[in-house]
Amino acid sequence: MSLTNEQIIEAIGQKTVLEVVELIKAMEETFGVTAAVAAAGPAAAAAVVEEQTEFNVVLVEAGEKKVNVIKAVRELTGLGLKEAKEKVDGAPQVVAEGVSKEAAEDAKKKLEEAGAKVELK
């Protein structure tokens, strides 16, 4: 006669906690297994990492061609001459915030061509 899962669960449910502990120990010895829960390793945490979708373009340093960098900042941001100069003089400054990867790379390329040192964050 074969027992169903429901019958086994019902039988275990009628036992005391001590009897269940003894049953678990007997099953571990009989089948050569342990009832310990395996801990998740660092590989599981690494799988959750998502690709960044929004970037900030940070002007780290204007470099030697400051006038060209000011022009590039004006073109990218739409700022006036005074505001663009203040942003360049105050480096490091965020030039573009929350932009797509493509837009951030384009802005970085334009600023670097103008002579600036730029980072994407």
UniProtKB/Swiss-Prot annotation:
Q: What Pfam families does this protein's entry cite?
A: Ribosomal_L12, Ribosomal_L12_N
Q: Which SUPFAM superfamilies match?
A: ClpS-like, Ribosomal protein L7/12, oligomerisation (N-terminal) domain
Keyword vocabulary terms for this entry: Ribonucleoprotein, Ribosomal protein
Q: What are the GO cellular component annotations?
A: cytosolic large ribosomal subunit
Q: Which CDD domains match?
A: Ribosomal_L7_L12
Asked if Methyltransferase is a keyword of the record, the answer is no
Q: Which GO terms describe its molecular function?
A: mRNA binding; structural constituent of ribosome
* Keyword Aminoacyl-tRNA synthetase assigned: no
Matches recorded under InterPro entries:
Ribosomal_bL12, Ribosomal_bL12_C, Ribosomal_bL12_C/ClpS-like, Ribosomal_bL12_oligo, Ribosomal_bL12_oligo_N_sf
Which family does the entry's similarity section mention? Belongs to the bacterial ribosomal protein bL12 family.
Known NCBIfam families for this protein? L12
Q: What does this protein do?
A: Forms part of the ribosomal stalk which helps the ribosome interact with GTP-bound translation factors. Is thus essential for accurate translation.
Q: Quaternary arrangement and interactors, per the entry?
A: Homodimer. Part of the ribosomal stalk of the 50S ribosomal subunit. Forms a multimeric L10(L12)X complex, where L10 forms an elongated spine to which 2 to 4 L12 dimers bind in a sequential fashion. Binds GTP-bound translation factors.
Protein name per Swiss-Prot or TrEMBL: Large ribosomal subunit protein bL12
Q: Which organism is it from?
A: Pseudomonas fluorescens (strain Pf0-1)
Instruction: Quote the gene name from the UniProt entry.
Output: rplL
